[in-house]
UniProtKB/Swiss-Prot annotation:
Family according to the record: Belongs to the acetyltransferase family. YpeA subfamily.
EC id: 2.3.1.-
SUPFAM superfamilies: Acyl-CoA N-acyltransferases (Nat)
Enzyme's top EC category: transferase
Entry-linked InterPro entries: Acetyltransferase_YpeA, Acyl_CoA_acyltransferase, GNAT_dom
Identification of the protein by name: Acetyltransferase ECA0875
Residue ranges of domain N-acetyltransferase in the record: 1-141
Protein's organism: Pectobacterium atrosepticum (strain SCRI 1043 / ATCC BAA-672) (Erwinia carotovora subsp. atroseptica)
A molecular function (GO) term: acyltransferase activity, transferring groups other than amino-acyl groups
PROSITE patterns attached to this UniProt entry: GNAT
C-alpha cells in the first residue's frame, strides 16, 4: 500500500470510492468539494493505493487553530487492513509538522464501526453540538 497526495488524474477514482463508501450526500457536489480542496492545502488530500487502485482517501485541513479530517473512506473490499489508520496517521504527521495542536472531525452518530476505529486511535467524543450553515448552494449530486 502506498499513501500519497491526491493527483488530478485521481478525480474519478476518488468519487467512485466515495460512492462505494456512502460518503456522498445530495447537497454536496463531490467534484466541487475536490476543486475547492485543490485550492486550499492540496497536500492534505491523501489517497491510499494498492496495486494501482485507489482504495482509500482522507481530505485534511488546517486553519491555524485546529486540523480537520473529511471524506475518510476505505473501499469495502479493503477494510480491516489498517488503511484508514494509515491515512489518519499520515494526516496527523502532516498536521503536526505544521504546528497543529489538535484535530477535530465529524462522524455520523450511527457509524459505530468508524467511531470505534477512532477511539482505538485515542480520539475522544467531545461534548459539543455541531452547527452548520450553507453559504453557497452546490448543485445536487
Amino acid at each position: 500500500m502506498e499513501i500519497r497526495i491526491f493527483r488530478q488524474d485521481d478525480f474519478e477514482a476518488v468519487i467512485t470510492l466515495w460512492e462505494r463508501c456512502d460518503l456522498l450526500r445530495p447537497w454536496n457536489d463531490p467534484e466541487m468539494d475536490i476543486e475547492r480542496k485543490l485550492n486550499h492545502d492540496p497536500d492534505l488530500f491523501l489517497v491510499a493505493e494498492v496495486n494501482g487502485e485507489i482504495v482509500g482517501s482522507v481530505m485534511g485541513g488546517y486553519d491555524g487553530h485546529r486540523g480537520s479530517a473529511y471524506y475518510l473512506g476505505v473501499h469495502p473490499d479493503f477494510r480491516g487492513r489498517g488503511i484508514a489508520n494509515a491515512l489518519i496517521s499520515r494526516l496527523e504527521k502532516k498536521l503536526i509538522a505544521r504546528g497543529c495542536p489538535k484535530i477535530h472531525l465529524m462522524v455520523r452518530e450511527d457509524n459505530d464501526a468508524v467511531i470505534g476505529m477512532y477511539e482505538k486511535l485515542e480520539y475522544e467524543t467531545v461534548d459539543c453540538i455541531t452547527l452548520g450553515k450553507r453559504l453557497i448552494e452546490d448543485r445536487e449530486y
